[in-house]
Amino acid sequence: MEKDHQPVISLRPGGGGGGPRPGRLFSPAFAAAASGSGDLLRSHVGGASKIGDPNFEVRERVRYTRDQLLELREIVDIPEAILRINQEIDIELHGEDQIWGRPESDVQVQTQTQAQPHNRYGETDNRDWRARTVQPPAANEEKSWDNIREAKAAHASSGRQQEQVNRQDQLNHQFASKAQVGPTPALIKAEVPWSARRGNLSEKDRVLKTVKGILNKLTPEKFDLLKGQLMESGITTADILKDVISLIFEKAVFEPTFCPMYAQLCSDLNEKLPSFPSEEPGGKEITFKRVLLNNCQEAFEGAESLRAEIAKLTGPDQEMERRDKERIVKLRTLGNIRLIGELLKQKMVPEKIVHHIVQELLGSGPDKKACPEEENVEAICQFFNTIGKQLDENPKSRRINDTYFIQMKELTTNLQLAPRLRFMVRDVVDLRSNNWVPRREEIKAKTISEIHDEAMKTLGLRPGATGLTRNGRNAPGGPLSPGGFPMNRPGTGGMMPGMPGTPGMPGSRKMPGMPGLDNDNWEVPRSKSMPRGDSLRNQGPLLNKPSSINKPSSINSRLLPHGSGALIGKSALLGSGGPPSRPSSLMASLTHTPAQTAPSPKPVSAAPAVVPVTDKAAGSSHEMPAAVQKKTVSLLEEYFGIRILDEAQQCIEELQCPEYYSEIVKEAINLALDKGPNFIDPLVRLLEHLHAKKIFKTEDLKTGCLLYAALLEDIGIDLPLAPALFGEVVARLSLSCGLSFEVVEEILKAVEDTYFRKGIFDAVMKTMGGNSSGQAILSSHAVVIDACNKLLK
């Protein structure tokens, strides 16, 4: 074989060698393939050449296919020098500790498979492998690549195992070194372990914590008890006193509804708590009153600076923060004003301070402003609502108040103020003109007993209503719950005996918005103008009520359950006196009359006897159209809200329906009595005004009263005070509008319930007996009074 023509093929980068490579012989087939430039060997010139190096400038880089490399693996042996260099590279890259578990060298693995070992490679080669030329292997060196791969896999596995052993040895060494020092020292515990709830509170912190708890529980009901605990909480130093006053002040300003209670507390504490010497030599002693007034003054004077700081928050990301701070400042300002007013009532604040505050809020003086700030306007309204009556009681203060209200009247027409504030100022001006009597009751904290007393006055509730009987009638029947309480129909409210909402009990009132029941026991929605009660009531048929022969006299439908009311009312309205097709056992047990136990009662005549007065009222009234009724209710609601007589007169004249004036009178009485006793006076003034203006005739007033009396038996179930209030209205109309006293007898005849009759008659006699003109009327109508007394028996 001719060596001059053998191509040199190398696996090193660049694809070339430095000349002929002895010992690198190929098989004839592979040599033939390497001699040409066919598909198996494609030359790429220029990409791998290095300028200046003759070995890389003219040589070709040869690429092999996968099949050729597989053939090379079978015939090529890796030289020992390459294996040695590979080991040195691993040492430099990974360190000796990563490969210390390997065999001495991969050369040993190689030499174990060779027939003639080379001892000169057993030593570590420290020469520079980059500068030396690779020595060609011996001709007889043959090694399979599979053996090399298996050897490398075994080497990696042994390296991982040795690494784990090495890590375990290091841990053992650490524990052994610690064991030589001695036993582990015991855990050192702190003398006072930290705890979120444990700690040694100082005397001041303990007192403040106690005071906070007392203030959180303070109510008008427990006022005296908790006030004593507060006095005994341990307020023994001036610092504790100041902090306690700060706590009370903060609670008061953020709870304005309870300001009267906190003002009373401050007054009592000012009398009971001791004073303390001043911290500064020659200073005034520290008292509860002085510290409290200083807090009020600082809060009042510091509000302006707080608003200035809030005004600086103009960034878009500060909008929420600005609103929150404005709300807090407003609450503190109004609460502070309310507290100062309540302290004035307790004689803890002199009037000169109050006048100074009013002048500051209104902007009086040399620097008088054309329009005060909105916060100041709201504060001054709050101030006069609280203490206006007290200031007017003093003649000197009243003259000063006159100047204040002149300026406030100017604010009612100042367009620079928001409409809400203008109306607020106007309400205060009207309040003073009305002798400081508010249109609606002020919301204030009440005790449980006060709430019960108010319920008795407003709803007519009486103690022990469940155990009492009225006019010899039994307690209401009906199904009982497992606890023994009456079962309720939907919308009847509570279920406890004697409470509002229990069927048939005094003060029984439906829940707002709940449906009513018609005479067939069907639930129907209630409208605002619908008469109150458990069933639908049509005005026409109800006015033509049959006489007592159609209805057993011993039964009071008000005391029957809701389901049984229809059994009686249905036959009465239809004009048939016979019992229903399925007699109720409940009705039989309540009546005990032979008329219901008889198998075939006699039918009543087609023309039952009717009270003549009721016929007269029915003949003179007509059913009001729905549109007119809606307008009537609307204008009456508006009048009871603003109470302007001329405007109400104009609205009634615009209806142009004189034939329905009696219905309007009835609606006015119904609406006023439904609202409560405070609306009796506006109702009477309205009817007197319309009668004086010749809009309502005396006959309209009489018919309207009779129409309402026909509904009173059902209305009285929901409004126990309705009979007494209605009697007062009738008496006042008799005194002022010329309503004849005989109408009282007619009204009593229209009401079948003796209890309601008595309520009406007693109210009439009481109202007219307290007036000289009324006494004259009573003396001239002794016959009518006797007839009324007979109706009460």
Swiss-Prot record:
Residues 1-23, 105-129, 462-606 are annotated as: Disordered. Disulfide bonds: none annotated. Residues 544-557 have a biased composition (Low complexity). GO terms for cellular component: eukaryotic translation initiation factor 4F complex. Disruption phenotype: Displays resistance to rice yellow mottle virus (RYMV) infection. It comes from the Eukaryota. Pfam families: MA3 (PF02847), MIF4G (PF02854). Residues 208-435 form the MIF4G domain. SUPFAM superfamilies: ARM repeat (SSF48371). Residues 627-749 form the MI domain. Belongs to the eukaryotic initiation factor 4G family. Plays a role in the accumulation of a sobemovirus (RYMV) during viral infection. EIF4F is a multi-subunit complex, the composition of which varies with external and internal environmental conditions. It is composed of at least EIF4A, EIF4E and EIF4G. In higher plants two isoforms of EIF4F have been identified, named isoform EIF4F and isoform EIF(iso)4F. Isoform EIF4F has subunits p220 and p26, whereas isoform EIF(iso)4F has subunits p82 and p28. This is Eukaryotic translation initiation factor isoform 4G-1.
